[in-house]
Amino acid sequence: MASTQCFLHHHALSTPARTSLVRGIVPSLKSNQLLVCRAQNKQSAPQQDNVNSVSVSRRLALTLLIGAAAVGSKVSPADAAYGEAANVFGKPKTDTDFQTYNGDGFKLQIPSKWNPNKEVEYPGQVLRFEDNFDATSNVIVAITPTDKKSITDFGSPEQFLSQVDYLLGRQAYSGKTDSEGGFESDAVAIANVLETSTAEVGGKQYYYLSILTRTADGNEGGKHQLVTATVNDGKLYICKAQAGDKRWFKGAKKFVENTATSFSLA
């Protein structure tokens, strides 16, 4: 009856030393050790030790080599946050939440789930995209002639906004009223400038404004409107992206901010 014995050999030794029989567990190997398995006959082990030693099968040897390689190598786990698919093959991930739009003299990133709309609200409007499920979340681009050489010729960002306040919507009601919610008498709409900044991109000055507008009858708690503006070749370029206040804090902020800040001259 045949049995299998495994011996651990050190390359430094001229005569291999026999180790005890390993049953069911393959020992860990160092780089200067070799695992040799020999088939022996139980009935005549001493006589057959030097004569009838048989190497393990190719399949077993291959299995041992693969196992040793796996132990000796470092495998980097696929990166994946909770709820995201693992990048198993290491290919770079692309942001599918946005699509690049190249217009006449400008470009920007638009949320992939927003659809084009032909509605025109503002002078010189050349583009409008809106959320599939909520038209309040949208972006427009308007291009109008100007005699200004730079956006800074309009004054400060706040002074510029006062000259294009039609972007925020005009108050249509002109009667007597006292509305709750911090509105002045006879006013049913209010706009608060939350943030302004300037930047130079490609040698051109840009204004960036973040505005919160509220109306007395609004059911969204107001609108967050982000405006990016610049001047080039006698044209005033304005990009305005917005979302309702409630949706702003439920995920719309990411899409509106990325859209407005991605706008630039082409």
Curated annotation (Swiss-Prot):
Family that this chain belongs to: Belongs to the PsbP family.
Transit peptide region: 1-80
An example Gene Ontology CC term for this record: chloroplast thylakoid membrane
UniProt source species: Nicotiana tabacum
Matching InterPro entries: Mog1/PsbP_a/b/a-sand, PsbP_C
SUPFAM superfamilies noted in UniProt: Mog1p/PsbP-like
GO molecular function: calcium ion binding
Keywords: Chloroplast, Membrane, Photosynthesis, Photosystem II, Plastid, Thylakoid, Transit peptide
Record protein name field: Oxygen-evolving enhancer protein 2-3, chloroplastic
PANTHER family cross-referenced by the UniProt entry: OXYGEN-EVOLVING ENHANCER PROTEIN 2-1, CHLOROPLASTIC, PTHR31407
One GO process term, biological-process aspect: photosynthesis
Signal sequence, start to end: none
UniProt-listed Pfam families: PsbP (PF01789)
